[in-house]
């Protein structure tokens, strides 16, 4: 199987991300070809500006995006340009709020043009980049010249020691806006989604996403906040305690929205090894059952951190396809999977567990290689799909029943490709769980008498809840994009002000004006603009990796219950009435044959035996389907409880968002106050 490198504009996998980083190059910058040949200085410069991120954030430095300030700093220090010339190159090469690798190479090509005294022509540089004929600019890449990254996070990282919540490795991948924008006429998990929503993230027209900002969200907490933005501010002890309290929000994963609301107590109760836990709610009456419903069925489950990363290489000889790296902390496994493997798993689960809340799969668009391009394989769509696949697996691992399924275990632990495993594995039996499991008396007693009333109430609320939640997610995402665009604009404002200072130094001034107060004030202003940009950029990453992704996970939860209701309506039908009528007809026929004059003949006795066997078989079938009805009721009741506790988990996410937003705004306030005091001291 041949492998080709992903297009050099691709923002691919980073190791171990709880939630991927919301960054991606703009579509205008994407080329979807193979990586062209560039001089070695281009790659060395790119590795330099991403070296701090490569070990922690990205599986491949080619997959990173960088802040515009890093490119500007490289051009002014290593490239020897003035602020005005560097600003001109940045604005020409980078049209969005981030700098992709293709933008970076284009900027270095423009730098070479400027060093040669040529007129800047971005189209010519892009053409040469595609053809692999770029020339090498003069760059001084010594470590003393460029220090591209700081080591600050937002909020600041707490010192080592016990924390309220165990921190997770902080790694990030790109995030895009998560309306899929895919008009799908198919069905997810067995339910046709066309009547209610024609798009995955359908929303009322008044909430249509604004297109005024061509923004791509920034690359993680670390590496965005400049050292100066926090070196200028001294935090008191109260601020330190405050930042320590907020540590859990950024180091944790917002996909914990599927965990218990009180995660601290849940983790304290977690055993080191898995324990069997009966998934039933025993009670004598519906009133007592309401007390049992207060217990979260997933509270004692050991936590499993699942990550899905996209490999930087495409596989396939003729038609290329993406390959994902799936990691599980609980199983200590790391395997490679294709989208078709998710599809296979979803189809198996919907056959085996039709009356459980199954996660939804993101849509798939067929990629056809045409003139070196892969249709529907743009960065935005692939990243949305990767995030959806990760949410799919996280929801599985948070479900008490689904996480223990053998096929789920195979998906997470089988080192071979699923297609190869299926060719050598025994035949799969995908019988519905209600047909092979017997409901005992205790489980029957766990079903509330008013289950139908509860389900009707849920059925009526779900459609409107899904519509409103989807609209809220889209609105919140618009806010995140605007903040990201504002961060980029503050950075560009810093570039412009530095250019003004450079030009202002050449203006005429009277001989008596020997002071440089004006330039110092403008320089201080430019510095606060960049600090504001860095801090806001980190905050955008924090919100995107936590609150926004948590909201999308909750939306998927609601959508999965809507699909469950659809399966209940379609599949909770059985042939019991037909079997009863056939039994009655067979019994009448047996009675008639017994009363006939030739009842002792061999043919009549043979017919009686056949009818008796048919009656026995139909009676067993009726018993099986009756057990299926009871099992379906028990399962639906369990899913109602599980959905309730998963939905309540949003409380903590919103509380953390408010706490972190307060810290962010207070940080900005202190930064501007410090700048005001510094300006007053300028003489």
Swiss-Prot record:
One of its GO terms (biological process) is retrograde transport, endosome to Golgi. Keywords: Cytoplasm, Membrane, Protein transport, Transport. Pfam families: PX, Snx8_BAR_dom. The keyword Transport applies. Belongs to the sorting nexin family. GO terms for cellular component: cytosol; endosome; membrane. The PX domain binds phosphatidylinositol 3-phosphate which is necessary for peripheral membrane localization. This is Sorting nexin MVP1. The keyword Cell membrane does not apply. GO terms for molecular function: phosphatidylinositol-3-phosphate binding. CDD domains: BAR_SNX8, PX_SNX8_Mvp1p_like. It comes from Mycosarcoma maydis (Corn smut fungus). SUPFAM superfamilies: PX domain. Residues 302-418 form the PX domain. Residues 1-25, 246-276 are annotated as: Disordered. InterPro entries: PX_dom (IPR001683), PX_dom_sf (IPR036871), SNX8/Mvp1 (IPR028662), SNX8/Mvp1_PX (IPR035704), Snx8_BAR_dom (IPR045734). It comes from the Eukaryota. PANTHER family: SORTING NEXIN MVP1 (PTHR47554:SF1). It is found in: Cytoplasm; Membrane. A 1,2-diacyl-sn-glycero-3-phospho-(1D-myo-inositol-3-phosphate) binds at residues 338, 340, 364, 385. Required for vacuolar protein sorting. It is a peripheral membrane protein. Residues 248-257 have a biased composition (Polar residues).
